[in-house]
Amino acid sequence: MHGFWRAALYAAALGVLAHPVGQALPRRWFDPHQAPYRCRDWEKGGRVYNKLHIRRWKDRLPDMSRLMPDMVKKKLSAADPMSLVQETCVAECVHCWLIVLSVGMLFLWKSVWSWLLWLVYNLLGNVSFILIQRYNRPRLLRLAEKETKKNAGNPYRRSTLSSATPFSDWKADSLPVS
């Protein structure tokens, strides 16, 4: 049974370490218009995720931004949509790596039950969050493009976007931090 506790401790350690690692990743690595983060044709601008009813259950999952004050909040003002778009890429990357690294649980607890624990851990703790990021990103990109167009004609309105086309001249360090 102590193999179970080692696997559980390993999973907990992955979860705890995921936040500081995600915060430390350079934001310039994450462009929502490039693979693997760009919306694929089969995703139909995020509409394919409506079949999974993500809108209904996404707010019921734990939100780490409530526990970690330095995390980007799930809900930001419309004035800063690109920051949130970028964070969806970071979150997707971190959760994908958590799936890969969680294979270590299978070596710590060699049991048929370890496969079940691994599957539940990844479906609830990682795949669901990846789906939420893939669902939200196209919607947030449309909001960012709308904001860009709205600000284009008004030189006195402060835009949080770096150029007329999101990420065309993009530098992560130029994004505002809220």
Give the label of every model feature segment.
Residues 130-178:
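Cytosolic/matrix-facing juxtamembrane and C-terminal tails of multi-pass cellular membrane proteins
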Residues 1-40, 90-108:
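Long, highly hydrophobic alpha-helical transmembrane signal-anchor segments
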Residues 76-98:
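Loop-to-transmembrane boundary segments
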Residues 22-36, 129-144:
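Inner-leaflet juxtamembrane helices
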Residues 94-138:
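Hydrophobic transmembrane alpha-helices
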Residues 29-84, 146-159, 164-166:
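Membrane-proximal soluble regions of multi-pass membrane proteins
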